[in-house]
């Protein structure tokens, strides 16, 4: 199983370099599509902790997950709020502790 640490703010691809420069955790649609392309249809796990972010970027990630041929699992390791819930809903299976948000 390939794993992506999905931590930080969901942002458009164009803002990725800015967030990287100021050392802010982020995930972009390109992060997701590159990860899925490298997984080559294997089952994947998104280890997620995100307070959300930009809805269009989250929608692009949701679409990429729904099109992915392998099984997509999400494990909420911190929180999943706002736009992050859109991404989470693209998974085949979501695991979340009752004490997580």
Over which residues does each language-model region extend?
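Terminal-region recognition feature
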Residues: 1-101
């Amino acid at each position: 199983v390939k794993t992506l640490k999905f931590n930080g703010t969901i942002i458009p691809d164009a803002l990725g370099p800015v967030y990287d420069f100021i050392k802010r955790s982020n995930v972009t649609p390109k992060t997701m599509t590159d990860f899925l392309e490298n997984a080559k249809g294997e089952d994947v796990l998104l280890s997620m902790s995100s307070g959300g972010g930009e809805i269009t970027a989250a929608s692009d990630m949701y679409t990429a997950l729904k099109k992915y041929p392998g099984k997509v699992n999400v494990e909420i390791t911190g929180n999943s709020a706002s736009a992050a819930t859109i991404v989470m809903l693209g998974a085949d299976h979501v695991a979340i502790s009752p004490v997580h948000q």
